Amino acid sequence: MHKALGLVLFLSIGAAGSGVGQMAPPGTGGVAALAGILEQLGANKRVLVIGAHPDDEDTQLLVLLSRGLGAQAAYLSLTRGEGGQNLIGPELGPGLGIIRTEELLAARDLDGARQYFTRAYDFGFSKSADESFRFWPRDSLLKDVVDVIRRFRPQIIVSVFSGTPADGHGQHQVAGLEIEVHQAPLVEVMKGGGDL
């Protein structure tokens, strides 16, 4: 595990907002296994958590990682939440995206994690990953995710979502699928090589 620069562990925590106290998918070992792996990594350990929207972040997990387990943690939100609902103000669309971006940046000040975004625009609810990919060019999204991985250089990537229809929202499914895309070519991705 000390040669983890090119090795990345992929975990799927499951539904957003409840990673620390929730049941992990079978075979992952959940947060306890993650803590054990981080301990083996020594002083330099980086964990990237990926979700689709600002409100998908698992703040409890980010705090545990950065403040409790001594890891450098980051959250990659595929969107800025422009397509979400706003029950407390008139802002919608890009205005709401600005508010939600600022909320995430303020949360990172508190939990000690870094914040990243892709260029994907939250166009509202979608029923499937295929529907989401009609609005988000797959190559552009992949490039953005790869750029974040190359900059942050995580040893562990945690997905808030599984990448399956069980995630419900199509954008959530895409966030889970982005993890699967990086499993095989990750050594090349981190080196800056490969076709990605």
Give the residues covered by each predicted segment.
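Bacterial N-terminal signal peptides
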Residues: 4-16
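Active-site rim/loop-helix segments in enzyme catalytic domains that contact anionic ligands
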Residues: 21-151, 173-184, 188
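Short acidic, glycine-rich surface-loop motifs adjacent to enzyme active sites
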Residues: 152-165
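Glycine/threonine-rich flexible loop motifs
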Residues: 164-173
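Active-site cores that bind ATP or allylic diphosphates and position pyrophosphate for catalysis
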Residues: 188-196
